[in-house]
């Protein structure tokens, strides 16, 4: 794999097909559960804890599937999708550093929602600050994250945990 510091939408789709990090690497979900359009920055030494940083973006438009059903007459992006996007990015980071296995969200310490994403918004930015990475037989990442819409931070999450598993049949 060619380890890059940014990834296009086509790269993210390749991850969803299992083509980006190899056949045993973690995959992102496919649309409509893929919650980002591009990864604009990745590094192993940056972030608030100097253990890695990921920044990704989602372009908002009223035709996104969730706006049609959540809620009729009062469209808003479900907050859980922003949380899932942060878990997706922690798993993506683990694959980027060479971790193998199927990604699973393992938990989160605290989540705060202080705003909303409406169909009139333009852009969502996700920021992930890795706090701890284990890349041995156990592959796990822990991070703090935030979701910003049009310049305002509206969600924060601490201790996002994602693990990579060789076998998920008994998970």
Swiss-Prot record:
Keyword terms, alphabetized: Cytoplasm, Fatty acid biosynthesis, Fatty acid metabolism, Isomerase, Lipid biosynthesis, Lipid metabolism, Lyase
Cellular localisation: Cytoplasm
Record pathway: Lipid metabolism; fatty acid biosynthesis
EC number: 4.2.1.59, 5.3.3.14
Keyword presence, rRNA-binding: no
Catalytic activity: a (3R)-hydroxyacyl-[ACP] = a (2E)-enoyl-[ACP] + H2O; (3R)-hydroxydecanoyl-[ACP] = (2E)-decenoyl-[ACP] + H2O; (2E)-decenoyl-[ACP] = (3Z)-decenoyl-[ACP]
Gene Ontology biological-process annotations: unsaturated fatty acid biosynthetic process
GO cellular component terms listed in the entry, alphabetical order: cytoplasm
InterPro entries given in the database record: FabA, FabA_FabZ, HotDog_dom_sf
Record-level Gene Ontology MF annotations: (3R)-hydroxyacyl-[acyl-carrier-protein] dehydratase activity; trans-2-decenoyl-acyl-carrier-protein isomerase activity
Chain segments annotated as coiled-coil in the UniProt record: none
Claim: Lipid metabolism is one of the keywords in the record: yes
UniProt main location, coarse: cytoplasm
Record's subunit section: Homodimer.
Similarity remark: Belongs to the thioester dehydratase family. FabA subfamily.
PANTHER family on file: 3-HYDROXYACYL-[ACYL-CARRIER-PROTEIN] DEHYDRATASE (PTHR30272), 3-HYDROXYDECANOYL-[ACYL-CARRIER-PROTEIN] DEHYDRATASE (PTHR30272:SF8)
Protein name per the record: 3-hydroxydecanoyl-[acyl-carrier-protein] dehydratase
Native source organism of the sequence: Histophilus somni (strain 129Pt)
